[in-house]
Amino acid sequence: NFNFSVIEKNFDSNTSKFKLNNRIKKFKMTSNEFFMTNSMKYDLIFVDGDHSSNQVKIDITNSWKILNKGGYLILDDYMWWFYKDLKKNPASSINNFIVNNISEISSLKIWQQVIIKRNIYLYFYFIQSIILK
């Protein structure tokens, strides 16, 4: 069992210096509630939510829609210990997302967390290839 109040206090302590100048904002709600009400775009999104493969897929897809080009998407618990079946593990949805969106990814780091940088040059390369033909 997890003591979420301790986890939240640690998060608040670790991010407190960024809250002073409004560089970070914590949203305390389900990701589905957040995506239904959010209208902003972000340079950095850190996803550490429901670890079921289906919800991870939804969270990644929704996060990608609001991630600025050149922004970073960080996905926690790549190989979640609770799910021994890879199809149920977050890694399954993360791997599928990477394969399906590789042309929009300029940098990728995988360990316990996955760090994806969204490509800012996708449209430039497309336009350049049309002009040069």
Predicted regions and their residues:
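S-adenosylmethionine/decaboxylated-SAM
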Residues: N1-K133
